[in-house]
């Protein structure tokens, strides 16, 4: 059974940094593209970015590429999202997803991040 479990919230200070993790199990993590997606309160899903199995290609939504860093550790079956210089609009539910062939077919339950002033 494929499982994705996000962690790393819930509170971060305005202008601060936070690192989210996504622990994967039930599949060969090292073979798959992985993505991060978020959903702010009352808004739709926003794709953050994706990383390939070799960590050689990392794609980001242009508006977020300067403040978010996606990485992975295949030995630990874990995906990461490093957030920096957070603002109030970064308050959201953050999801990791398995994304073979650019179609996200397995999702975690999400981890909540609240930016506090």
Curated annotation (Swiss-Prot):
Disulfide bonds join 22-96. SUPFAM superfamilies: Immunoglobulin (SSF48726). Coiled coil: none annotated. GO terms for biological process: immunoglobulin mediated immune response. The keyword Transmembrane helix does not apply. It comes from the Eukaryota. Keywords: Adaptive immunity, Disulfide bond, Immunity, Immunoglobulin. Residues 1-116 form the Ig-like domain. GO terms for cellular component: extracellular region; immunoglobulin complex. The keyword Lipoprotein does not apply. One of its GO terms (molecular function) is antigen binding. This gamma-2a chain was isolated from a myeloma protein. This is Ig heavy chain V region MOPC 173.
């Amino acid at each position: 059974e494929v499982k994705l479990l996000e962690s790393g919230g819930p509170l971060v200070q305005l202008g601060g940094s936070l690192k989210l993790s996504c622990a994967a199990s039930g599949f060969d993590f090292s073979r798959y593209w992985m993505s991060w997606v978020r959903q702010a309160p009352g808004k739709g899903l926003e794709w953050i970015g994706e990383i390939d199995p070799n960590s050689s290609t990392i794609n980001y939504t242009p508006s977020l590429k300067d403040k978010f860093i996606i990485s992975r550790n295949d030995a630990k079956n874990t995906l990461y999202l490093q957030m920096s210089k957070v603002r109030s609009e970064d308050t959201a539910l953050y999801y990791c997803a398995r994304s073979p062939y650019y179609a996200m077919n397995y999702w975690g339950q999400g981890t909540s991040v609240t930016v506090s002033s």
